[in-house]
C-alpha cells in the first residue's frame, strides 16, 4: 500500500466531511427592514417572512402540516439542539428564548454575581446555537419585568447589556424581549433603555384586539411580535358572585383566536404572532389555554389557526358547541340538583361521544409558572348524563366545576365547563378511580418531590421514551454508586412531610398497581404507600409496603393490597427505597395507579 497516498485520501475525506458540516451549520441571515410606507418586515435569506407560529409541546409535524412556519421556546433546554434539527427537517424556524430570572421567584437584579452568571449563560447559549439554520431570532426573557408597572430600570439595563453582547457575536439574527402586555411603563422602558432591542415581544390575551392602537398611543415605534395570544386570561374575566371565573367553550375560544389574530396582523408594526398553547396545559382549569387535550385530541382553535396559516380548513373539523347552559341558579343547598343542557354537533355529521366530570375548585387560581392544582374527578355525584346534558347532586358545601368533553372519535374534540357552588359545610368526597400517580394521559396530582437519604446520587427522568410499558414515556431512575440508603416519595403538597393540609380520599381503592423493570435484573427495592405517621398534623391514614422486591429485566406488574385500609387521606401515595449499594442501580417505573 502507498501509505502517503492513503494519508492524502483520508485527509481529503476528512476535509470534505468538515466542509459539509460547516455548510450544514451555516446560519440563514435574518434582517429587519422598514419600508417607506412605514411597514416593518422580517427578511429571511432576503425573502419576506411573516411569523405564523405557536409555542408548546405538541407535535411539530402537525404544526408544519397546519401551515405554521415558526415555534418559540421560553428558554434554552438540553433538547434545544434536537428541536432545532427537527424544525429544519420540517421547514420550520425557531425563536430561541433565553429565560431570565424573575424577582418574584427570588432573582435579584442588584446582585452582581447573579447577573454575571445569567450574562455568561446567555452568551454561551448564543455561541452554541447562532449558526444553526433554523434559528430565526433571539428572545431575551419572558415577563421578567413582573406584573406591576414594569419600570425597574436595572432590569432593562441588564437586558440592554445582553442585547448589545449578542449583537457583537451574532449579526444574523434580530433580538427581542418579551413583556406581559404593555401596561405601565413597559413600552417606554424598552424604547428608552434598550436601544439594541430590535423588536418588542408582547404576551396579550383579552386585550389583543385593542393592542395595536394602544401601542401607538404609548408612542411604540419598534416593530412588535405577539409572542402569546389566546382566550382572555383569568385576570381579565368577570368572576361569579362566589369568585370563580367562567370559561369560554372551545368553540367560543376559536372565534376569539380568529378575531385577535386578524386585528393584530393588520398593524404595519406587527411581524407575526404565536398562538398559545400548542399542547395541553393545566392553568386555572385543565382546558383554559390548551389547543389540544392531554390525550392528544385537537380543539377548535387548531382548526381556526390551520385555516389562517394555510388558507384552507382541515378535512376533519372539531365538534361545535352550539349551546351549553346551566338551568337555574349556580348556587344551591346540599342535596339539591344542578341541571346542564348541551347542544353539540359535528360539522361532518359524525356521532359525538360526550364525557362529563365534576371536580372541586381550587382555593386560589395560580397563573404563569406557579405550581398548578390538578383537577380530579369526583365519584357518585353525576346522577345522569348524555350527549344532551347532565344532572348532578352534591351532598356537601363547596365550589365545584362541571367539565364536558365531546369527542368525534377521529382526533377532534370540544370542551365546556361551568363553576357551581353548594352552600353549607364541606362534605368528605371520594375521587373517581382509576387515579394515577404516574401514567400517560392521566392528571398527576402528586409530585415526586420527597427525595430521601443519600439522594445526591439520584437522577430521575419522568419523560424517558425508550421502551415504556405503555404510552410514550416512563420514569427512568438511576442511583450512582457507591451510596447509602436512598429513595423518592410522591407527595401532596410537594415537598411536604406532614406540616401542610393535602392528600386525597381514596376510600374506593382496593389496590395500588405499578409496572417496574431493572436495567440488569435482580435489583432489590422496597415499594410502598404512605410514609407520614400520626405524630404529624397532616398524616397518611394508611401505610403498607412491599419489601425487597427483586426486579426483572422485562416489565412486570406489581400490586399493593389496600383492602381494609383507611384511605381517607393519602398524602404519600407511592414511594421506593433502595438500601446502600456499591453498584450503580438503574430501574424504570410506569403506570402507577390506584384501582
State what each model feature region is.
Residues 33-37, 43-197, 209-210, 373-376:
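Active-site mouth of glycoside hydrolases
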Residues 36, 44-53, 216-372, 382-387, ...:
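Substrate-binding clefts and catalytic carboxylate motifs of secreted carbohydrate-active enzymes
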Residues 163-187, 202-205, 223-234, 272-275:
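Aromatic-lined carbohydrate-recognition surfaces of secreted/lumenal glycan-active proteins
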Residues 181-212, 234-238, 279-286:
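Substrate-binding cleft/loops of secretory-pathway carbohydrate-active enzymes
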Residues 339, 399-403, 511:
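Short, conserved beta-strand segments of beta-strand-rich sandwich/propeller modules, principally
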Residues 416-423:
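C-terminal edge beta-strand
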Residues 425-595:
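Beta-rich carbohydrate-recognition modules and glycan-binding surfaces
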Amino acid at each position: 500500500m502507498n501509505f502517503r497516498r492513503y494519508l492524502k485520501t483520508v485527509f481529503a475525506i476528512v476535509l470534505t466531511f468538515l466542509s459539509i458540516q460547516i455548510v450544514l451549520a451555516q446560519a440563514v441571515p435574518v434582517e429587519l427592514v422598514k419600508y417607506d410606507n412605514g411597514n416593518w418586515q422580517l427578511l429571511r435569506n432576503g425573502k419576506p417572512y411573516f411569523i405564523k407560529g405557536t409555542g408548546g409541546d405538541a407535535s411539530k409535524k402537525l404544526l408544519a402540516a397546519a401551515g405554521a412556519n415558526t415555534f418559540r421556546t421560553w428558554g434554552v433546554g438540553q433538547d434545544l439542539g434536537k428541536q432545532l434539527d427537527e424544525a429544519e427537517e420540517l421547514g420550520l424556524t425557531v425563536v430561541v428564548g433565553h429565560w431570565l430570572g424573575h424577582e418574584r421567584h427570588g432573582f435579584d437584579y442588584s446582585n452582581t454575581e447573579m447577573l454575571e452568571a445569567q450574562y455568561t449563560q446567555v452568551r454561551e447559549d448564543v455561541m452554541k446555537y447562532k449558526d444553526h439554520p433554523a434559528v430565526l431570532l433571539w428572545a431575551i426573557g419572558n415577563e421578567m419585568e413582573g406584573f406591576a408597572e414594569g419600570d425597574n430600570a436595572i432590569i432593562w439595563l441588564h437586558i440592554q447589556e445582553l442585547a448589545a453582547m449578542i449583537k457583537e457575536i451574532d449579526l444574523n439574527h434580530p433580538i427581542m424581549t418579551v413583556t406581559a402586555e404593555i401596561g405601565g411603563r413597559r413600552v417606554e422602558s424598552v424604547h428608552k433603555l434598550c436601544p439594541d432591542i430590535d423588536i418588542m415581544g408582547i404576551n396579550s390575551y383579552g386585550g389583543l384586539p385593542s393592542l395595536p392602537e394602544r401601542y401607538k398611543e404609548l408612542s411604540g415605534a419598534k416593530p412588535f411580535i405577539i409572542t402569546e395570544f389566546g382566550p382572555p386570561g383569568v385576570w381579565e374575566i368577570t368572576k361569579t358572585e362566589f369568585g370563580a371565573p367562567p370559561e369560554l367553550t372551545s368553540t367560543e375560544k376559536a372565534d376569539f383566536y380568529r378575531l385577535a389574530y386578524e386585528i393584530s396582523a393588520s398593524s404595519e408594526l406587527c411581524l407575526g404572532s404565536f398562538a398559545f398553547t400548542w399542547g395541553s396545559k393545566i392553568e386555572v382549569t385543565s382546558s383554559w389555554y390548551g389547543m389540544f387535550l392531554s390525550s392528544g385530541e385537537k380543539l377548535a382553535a387548531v382548526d381556526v389557526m390551520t385555516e389562517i396559516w394555510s388558507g384552507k380548513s382541515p378535512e376533519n373539523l372539531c365538534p361545535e358547541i352550539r349551546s351549553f347552559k346551566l338551568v337555574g341558579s349556580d348556587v344551591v343547598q346540599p342535596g339539591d340538583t344542578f341541571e346542564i343542557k348541551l347542544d353539540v354537533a359535528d360539522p361532518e355529521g359524525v356521532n359525538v361521544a360526550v364525557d362529563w366530570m365534576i371536580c372541586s375548585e381550587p382555593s386560589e387560581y395560580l397563573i404563569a409558572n406557579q405550581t398548578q392544582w390538578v383537577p380530579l374527578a369526583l365519584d357518585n355525584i353525576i346522577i345522569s348524563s348524555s350527549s344532551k346534558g347532565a344532572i348532578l347532586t352534591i351532598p356537601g358545601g363547596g365550589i365545584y366545576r362541571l367539565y364536558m368533553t365531546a369527542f368525534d372519535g377521529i382526533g377532534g374534540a370540544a370542551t365546556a365547563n361551568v363553576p357551581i357552588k353548594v352552600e353549607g359545610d364541606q362534605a368528605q368526597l371520594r375521587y373517581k378511580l382509576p387515579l394515577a400517580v404516574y401514567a400517560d394521559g392521566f392528571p398527576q396530582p402528586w409530585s415526586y418531590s420527597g427525595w430521601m437519604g443519600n439522594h445526591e446520587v439520584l437522577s430521575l427522568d419522568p419523560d424517558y421514551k425508550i421502551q415504556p410499558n405503555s404510552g410514550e414515556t416512563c420514569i427512568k431512575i438511576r442511583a450512582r454508586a457507591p451510596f447509602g440508603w436512598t429513595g423518592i416519595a410522591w407527595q401532596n403538597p410537594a415537598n411536604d412531610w406532614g406540616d401542610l393540609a393535602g392528600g386525597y380520599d381514596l376510600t374506593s381503592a382496593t389496590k395500588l398497581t405499578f409496572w417496574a423493570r431493572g436495567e440488569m435484573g435482580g435489583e432489590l427495592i422496597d415499594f410502598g404507600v404512605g410514609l407520614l405517621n400520626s405524630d404529624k398534623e397532616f398524616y397518611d391514614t394508611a401505610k403498607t409496603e412491599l419489601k425487597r422486591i427483586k426486579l426483572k429485566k422485562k416489565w412486570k406488574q406489581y400490586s399493593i393490597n389496600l383492602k381494609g385500609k383507611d384511605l381517607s387521606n393519602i398524602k404519600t401515595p407511592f414511594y421506593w427505597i433502595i438500601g446502600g449499594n456499591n453498584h450503580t442501580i438503574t430501574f424504570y417505573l410506569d403506570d402507577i395507579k390506584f384501582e
